Amino acid sequence: PGDHWQKLANLRALLTYQITRPGKSLLFMGTELAVPSEWNHEQSLDWHLVHDPTRAAFLLFVARLGDLYRRTPALWARDGEPEGFEWIDAADHASSVLSYLRRARDDHAVVALNLTPMPRGRYRIGVPEPGEYRCILSSDESRWGGGDYGASPRVTADDIPYHGRRYSLELELPPLSAVIYVPARSRSSAERA
């Protein structure tokens, strides 16, 4: 739903959700181009869309997601194990925000999705350890076609219990977006650059 910008923002959030959930992800016939029409086996993909700057930015976002997945073991190392995924909050109906952890053996990633067209400022989520976290993805960056609302590149966990965890992060969540944070000490070679 929404205008062209909102549709692409929703699709960026959806693909981030898809790739950060357990299991293998599949892009099908034009998803990487944000093709507005349903796939039709009787015609080719709408390759002309790569000349549209918003679709070109979306294609760069999809490439970034693939690279991020490859470089962040917490997103895939324990796909087949229950310990590889943990909800932080799956029930915030009032704010329409989902948050969860993905885990490798000695690392984790924090994923938060704001599924409304309203920014969520000072949004708190519980995390498993103290220290600094770095943002390795914000789907709202202008280079992907987003609005650059301003997800913080680095944030320090507060000693404030939240969501049943001893520490918490206070995040700025852009509208219709996904953000991924990892501990600054993380071995993930993915950088938000």
PLM regions and their residue ranges:
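Carbohydrate-interacting/catalytic domains
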Residues: 2-27, 31-193
